[in-house]
Regions:
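Contiguous, structured surface segment used for ligand recognition
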Residues: 1-91
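Substrate-binding cleft of carbohydrate-active enzyme catalytic domains
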Residues: 89-255
């Protein structure tokens, strides 16, 4: 309610007081209905008040619709009844924070605000090396990585806006920055990974981890152990895609 109060104040120029109990004439009334779907809501505007009734997340989504109405109509809203709910349960955005500039926490929060406004409910940040792994400093030391504290703060920020922040960590293919480093190049499927000239195509098509080396699994598990506890999500995206070199080098005999 406080988040909605602040958003409406920015659009209307005056603050609506928060309280609990029975609604009165002129109030914006928010009420949960356990019988409704979790993300469903009904928004009604009549001569008496504005009422948003919905499931646990539905009330929040109804508030986003109310904000959009205020942007269009100002303080004088039309009489209306809106019944709404999603057809798609997971409405997410996948954002690459590895190839290119690493965004600041303030930017990621603005992204979460915009996602909430459009009733999106899942955010994944694609990471190869742009997290400050305490045990693997060699892979991020030339960058400005996201920290554990920033991830936890963003996770809480997303939760408050109905967004699940899902960890997404590259664990198999195109580990360019990792497998071109001196300390970990021996884990690459192809020989001489640290000597390959940089190219965008090469970055995507090579630098697959060698699955036949037991050290590879321990390295990946170590990254996951450090990264996973920072999130409240029960999901984890290991990004095991685009392993173009698999079976073409050190693992050829096992392929």
């Amino acid at each position: 309610a406080a988040l909605v109060q602040k958003a409406l104040e920015e659009k209307l120029g005056f603050a609506l007081a928060l309280t609990r109990g029975e609604g009165r004439k002129g109030d914006v009334i928010l009420e949960q209905c356990p019988q409704m779907g979790k993300e469903d809501y009904i928004l009604t505007v009549d001569a008496e008040n504005v009422r948003i009734t919905g499931g646990e997340a539905g009330v929040w989504y109804g508030c986003q619709t109310l904000q959009q109405m205020v942007e269009q109509c100002g303080a004088v809203l039309p009489v209306v009844k809106i019944e709404d709910g999603p057809d798609i349960p997971n409405r997410g955005f996948y954002h690459d924070v590895t190839r290119g500039r690493v965004p600041k926490l303030s930017f990621l929060k603005k992204m979460a605000d915009r996602m909430a406004y459009y009733k999106m409910n899942q955010l994944q940040l694609y990471i190869e090396h742009t997290f400050l792994f305490r045990d693997f400093s060699e892979i991020w030391r030339d960058d400005t990585p996201l920290t554990a504290e920033e991830i936890m703060e963003l996770d809480q920020y997303c939760l408050e806006r109905g967004i699940e922040l899902v960890p997404s960590l590259s664990c198999f293919g195109h580990l360019y920055k990792v497998l071109s480093s001196k300390g970990y190049s021996h884990l690459c499927e192809l020989e001489g990974a640290d000597q390959m000239p940089f190219s965008l195509r090469g970055r995507m098509h090579h630098h697959t981890i060698n699955v036949t080396d037991p050290e590879s699994l321990e390295f990946i598990k170590g990254k996951i152990r450090e990264f996973m506890p920072l999130f409240t999500s029960r999901q984890f995206n290991i990004c095991a895609d685009e392993t173009f070199d698999l079976g073409k080098g050190k693992s050829r005999a096992a392929a």
